[in-house]
């Protein structure tokens, strides 16, 4: 069976894990992730909750890989971006009201 070259990436705030390797043509994303060994290196990765993509495009674990694909495993968000914006806006409004009252 023919082999294809792929990469698997997992990013942290302070560092980046990237591994290049060859897999059999026709392999699925999930099988490649399992074969890469990344799940034993980073036990916090949970394929049922972590989002997965190829070059920033969301994919399914059942998708078949192509030559040169880079599987990206995304960490869960620590906070909801909408909630952070609401909180920041409320804090800024409170600060403006305080300045007007002073």
Curated annotation (Swiss-Prot):
Q: Which InterPro entries match?
A: Mopterin_synth/thiamin_S_b (IPR016155), RnfH (IPR005346), RnfH_sf (IPR037021)
Q: Highest taxon of the source?
A: Bacteria
Report the SS bond pairs. none
Task: Check the record and name the Pfam families matching this protein.
Answer: Ub-RnfH (PF03658)
Can you tell me which family this protein belongs to? Answer: Belongs to the UPF0125 (RnfH) family.
Q: List, alphabetically, the HAMAP family matched.
A: UPF0125_RnfH
Name of the protein: Protein RnfH
Report the source organism.
Haemophilus influenzae (strain PittEE)
Name of the coding gene: rnfH
């Amino acid at each position: 069976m023919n082999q294809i070259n792929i990469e698997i990436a997992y990013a942290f705030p302070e560092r980046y894990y990237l591994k290049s390797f060859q897999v059999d043509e026709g392999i699925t994303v999930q099988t490649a992730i399992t074969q890469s060994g990344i799940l034993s290196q980073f036990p916090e990765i949970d394929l049922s909750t972590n989002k997965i993509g190829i070059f920033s495009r969301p994919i399914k674990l059942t998708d078949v890989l192509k030559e040169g694909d880079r599987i990206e495993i995304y960490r869960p968000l620590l906070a909801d971006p909408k909630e952070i914006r609401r909180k920041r806006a409320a804090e800024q409004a409170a600060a403006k009201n305080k300045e007007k009252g002073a």
